[in-house]
Amino acid sequence: MHTRIWFFCWLTILAQPASAGVEVEPRLQIQGVSHSPEQPRSGQVVKIVAQVANQPGKVSLHVEYQVVDPGKYIDLTDSAYKTNWLYLAMNDSGKNGDEKAGDGIYTVELPAELQIHRRLVRYRITATDSSGQTNTAPALSDSEPNFAYFVYDGIPGWSGAIDPNSNDPRKKQIVRYDPAVMASVQAYHFISKGRSVANATWREQSGGKEYKYTGTLVSDGKVYDHVRFRARGGVWRYAMGKNMWKFDFNKGHPFQARDDYGQPYRVKWGKLNLRACIQQGDYGQRGEQGMFESVGFRLFSLAGVAAPRTHWLQLRIIDLAEENPTNQYRGDFWGLYLALENEDGHFLDEHGLPDGNLYKMENGSGTLSHHGTGAVTNSSDLHQFMSAYNTGNRAEPWWRAHLDLASYYSYRSIIECIHHYDVADGKNYDYYLNPKTGRWNVIPWDIDLTWADNMYGNGEEPFRSRVLTHPAFHVEYQNRLREIRDLLFNPEQTGQLIDECAAIIADPAGGPSLVDADRAKWDYHPVMARIGGKAGQGRFYEAAASKDFRGMLKSMKDYVKNRAAWIDANLLNDPRIPATPSLLGAGSTNLTRNHLSFRCSQYSGSGVFAAMKWRVAEAGKQPAEFGQAKARMPCEITAVWESAEGAAFNPSITIPPEVVRAGRTYRVRVQMKDQTGRWSYWSAPIQFTVAPPAG
């Protein structure tokens, strides 16, 4: 059941003027409005109820509803929005769908014939008291002045060829994508006028941030009405043909996004960014289908850097009467897109960051995108920070006081791992000032031009040459990069992430999938030929030897191997680090929780021993829930337990039993540090499964 509660939509009924010792009659409140089912199918009766509390006398309620058919969208500013409403009385008689007479819950049933596939139905409630005074729900001041539901019978199958006009039989072959394939990735339906959609995405070529058009977004059966939208992006906003979108939700009606596994994010979104999953054609990487950013942002996040959540979706735009015309380049299906969490106050809440100032950085300066409570409003905090590091060399204490160095080392490490070098022009990152620590953090953004050494930029963001030239900072940075190489950016762990993400949008067995349907929709779409340049036709999978999506995944995995070798040779070549320790055999790969004892080799290195530490992390595919694809697989960089740094060498450790669970698989490692602050590589792991208790 869809419900919105309206505590501030009321009729004020006064028995007499308020004065000392004189009571005011209770105000008539419309406390709740709901409809069921939440997303009806064709031919279903829809029940609408409204609850009224503290009735001061006879009250009547009625519903007004407006029908919006496919291809006939009605904007909020259209005259038809004001006039095209039909009236039905609601009742509290215990009849005609009402459950109980006189309980203050009013009911009306919208007839089955009203529900037609792809139809949007808006409604609002009006209450009238015995004196003729009226009020409505939603309130007239509400940014969404009506409720709504969307009638839908399910995503249909779709058919398309790689190039229906080709002389190549393989490209011309029509492939049928059945409804199960088309429903394998969550769908967002967007209802608007055809001209509004075309103007925003192709015709007007507007480079500004003004939201000129509105539409209705439907996700998980919930309707977000009168949402503003525009194309998004910088200099290449309209260059790819299949362009990016940005939606701005109404105040008080944030968007409940869900991840790739259907789980709702903890914090709702005020804005929705859609990546087009198309890549700039001249870089040869088209067909990665959003994998670069999905995996890339996961790497940032796993390394401890606050980074946008992402999830895939298929965008279905309803601006025509027909859902699936014979022309594969028309109709509702617009292909595969990647949703990116907007970097704003919602982002800070989602990532558990204190409420501080957040700046979108462009052209060497910043625009306040979120104002933290109690923080400055004139950007003086940003100006002071930038002025300080741009004028003269700052000493180590200044950097430690003003920049979150631990976070920066992780940020810089992932920049190197995925070649996120498009940061050199003062863009593609945000600055965030943590009000509790007083330190600035860098938050990554726009990481599509990655995973290949020919991508744009030289990687020279503001802190690389200013921070990492300090010897102490350089050692600390290398320590972190070395750890990320051991535990995250390696063929096994990053390869696991690549496979995990790819399985969301493609069939691991090689059957038809959304990536194939998207390729059929866009590789030879007429708009790609008209635009040319970074668009162009027939550019999917150029980087893959096998010329398919599976080949693009192999290209990413090969890049991990090659880039890791480059990092080791060029960024981590330090002969002074301690030797990598070894773990001595545990005697069994099946251990009980109370017998988790391990030993390591002696310290070895050119420097004097200073410290050591141990860690335990989950490893491998876990049982049950992961087989059902309802959760992500564990990554080794996320420890379940880490020891404190031990200043005295002790070759033995016993893992606390409470940190592991029976039936799970874990890895234990050890690491050594010398007196110069250099940490060794982590030891090769011992992997073990925790056996259930005996008996």
Protein language model regions, located:
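Recognizes extended acidic, P/S/T-rich segments that occur
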Residues: S93-I105, L114-Q115, R615-R661
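Middle-to-C-terminal accessory/interaction subdomains
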Residues: M240, Q285, S387-D425, Y429-S604
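Short Trp-Ser/Thr-centered turn/loop motifs at beta-strand boundaries
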Residues: A137, S643, S680-P685
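Glycan-association/targeting regions that enable binding to alpha-glucans and other polysaccharides
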Residues: S19-V218, T580-N590, H595, G663, ...
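Internal "kinase-insert"/substrate-recognition segments embedded within catalytic cores
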Residues: F190, M244-Y283, G290, L302-P308, ...
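Beta-strand-rich modules
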Residues: V660-Q675
